[in-house]
């Protein structure tokens, strides 16, 4: 193989997602997931050139064993030799990183410094970087960090500050950071292409809807606000996260209900959202499939879409210019026609009129405009964060 490929690593605390992409064509050569780290059933599954495989990693296996298995067992010699750089998804870069960077000792320290804002993710990313250095020592200078928070660093102060004592921001960095930046960036850029608008002129509201969900207001190609905040807990209703709520509810849960801080955190992060509202599941497909026959399903989806529509409406105001499109992406955004329909029905005041046939067709990888002709545009665009990571890595390494 003469082409230069990029290995993409997305390390979680107990898992490792990986892929190998051609950054020019976008062709995916390998994808996979290693999971259940530190447990008796640690395992790995992958798809190489269209063929699937899986294996046990051994009890207690983690990032090191997974990466060693990838290098020694999954990769062919040709594929291994074609890897020219490694791209690392990093959840939090704090205020320091506004774009992707080649990983140096200084960058590693920066990721460590931001770990207090992402205590589950950033330490895992650092493990992934360390293991990548060991597995591919000849590529040490070709490792690149792509930050989830970077795209949102163009937010103005009035958008990222909380109305708390200013010292909390100055001394401790308490502010809005946002997440899903790579996805919001990708679909805003793709919207510009599809609508034949320059990337630095596009005005869109991007809705990344999945188990985690966020909205971003993008004016002239730059993010000016986003719904996730200091952590991914703020904003929209999500699979298991509450999103926005009155902070005094936390005091009530602690002082009156006797719940510990750990119990409250678990409730807000793991037991709320669609799971909390349905009392059945965090899977949006349940609510969509049972919307007409189960009150719990209807309740959950109505709250989800109402919250989403409120954010979209408020972002229309702050963009302050002609809005080119509302973009739906992510697992729910790309596939849940009913979510898009209910949400856009809330926005009829602004002229949005859904085309039922187009909306129903836009799923399972199909994309396109879902609103009626000669009405404001809403469009479904599948996200591809891996491609952004591959392209940024190639740009900084090749």
From Swiss-Prot:
Any one cellular-component term (Gene Ontology): cytosol
Note on how the cofactor is bound: Mg(2+). Can also accept Mn(2+).
Enzyme Commission code: 2.7.2.1
Site for Transition state stabilizer, residues: 180, 241
Positions annotated as active site in the UniProt record: 148 (proton donor/acceptor)
Protein family membership: Belongs to the acetokinase family.
Entry binding sites for Mg(2+): 10, 385
Needed cofactors: Mg(2+); Mn(2+)
Pathway(s) of this molecule: Metabolic intermediate biosynthesis; acetyl-CoA biosynthesis; acetyl-CoA from acetate: step 1/2
Keywords, sorted A to Z: ATP-binding, Cytoplasm, Kinase, Magnesium, Metal-binding, Nucleotide-binding, Transferase
Enzyme's top EC category: transferase
Organism: Histophilus somni (strain 129Pt)
InterPro entries hit by this protein: Ac/propionate_kinase (IPR004372), Aliphatic_acid_kin_short-chain (IPR000890), Aliphatic_acid_kinase_CS (IPR023865), ATPase_NBD (IPR043129)
Subunit organization: Homodimer.
UniProt binding sites for substrate: 89
Protein name: Acetate kinase
Biological role: Catalyzes the formation of acetyl phosphate from acetate and ATP. Can also catalyze the reverse reaction.
NCBIfam families tied to this protein: ackA (TIGR00016)
Reaction(s) catalysed by this chain's protein: acetate + ATP = acetyl phosphate + ADP
């Amino acid at each position: 193989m003469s082409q230069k490929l990029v290995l993409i690593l997305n390390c979680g605390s107990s898992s490792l997602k990986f892929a190998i992409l051609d950054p020019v064509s976008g062709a995916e050569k390998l994808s996979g997931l290693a999971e259940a780290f530190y447990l008796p059933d640690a395992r790995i599954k992958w798809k190489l050139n269209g063929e699937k495989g899986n294996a046990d990693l051994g009890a207690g296996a983690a990032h090191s064993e997974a990466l060693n298995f990838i290098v020694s067992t999954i990769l062919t010699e040709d594929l291994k030799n074609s890897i020219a750089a490694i791209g690392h998804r990093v959840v939090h870069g704090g205020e320091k990183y506004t774009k992707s960077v080649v990983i140096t000792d200084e960058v590693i320290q920066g990721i460590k410094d931001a770990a207090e804002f992402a205590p589950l993710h950033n330490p895992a990313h650092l493990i992934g970087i360390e293991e990548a250095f060991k597995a591919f020592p000849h590529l040490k200078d070709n490792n690149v960090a792509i930050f989830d928070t970077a795209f949102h660093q163009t937010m103005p102060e009035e958008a990222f500050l909380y109305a708390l004592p200013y010292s909390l921001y100055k001394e401790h960095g308490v502010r809005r950071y946002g997440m899903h930046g790579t996805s919001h960036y990708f679909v805003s850029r793709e919207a510009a292409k599809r609508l034949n608008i320059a990337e630095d002129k596009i005005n869109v509201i991007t809705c990344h809807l999945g188990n985690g969900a966020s909205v971003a207001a993008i004016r002239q190609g730059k993010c000016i606000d986003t719904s996730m905040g200091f952590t991914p807990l703020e904003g929209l209703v999500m699979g298991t996260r509450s999103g926005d709520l009155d902070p005094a509810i936390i005091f009530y849960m602690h002082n009156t209900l006797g719940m510990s801080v750990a119990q409250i955190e678990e409730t807000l992060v793991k037991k709320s959202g669609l799971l909390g509202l349905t009392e059945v599941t965090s899977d949006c497909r349940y609510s969509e499939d049972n919307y007409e026959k189960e009150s719990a399903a209807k309740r959950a989806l109505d709250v989800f879409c109402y919250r989403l529509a409120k954010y979209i409406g408020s972002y229309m105001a702050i963009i302050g210019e002609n809005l080119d499109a509302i973009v739906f992406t992510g697992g729910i955004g790309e596939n849940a026609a009913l979510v898009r329909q209910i949400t856009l029905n809330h926005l009829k005041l602004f002229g949005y009129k859904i085309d039922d046939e187009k909306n129903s067709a836009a799923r399972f990888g199909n994309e396109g405009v879902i609103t009626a002709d000669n009405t404001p545009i809403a469009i479904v665009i599948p996200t591809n964060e891996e491609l952004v990571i591959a392209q940024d890595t190639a740009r900084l390494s090749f």
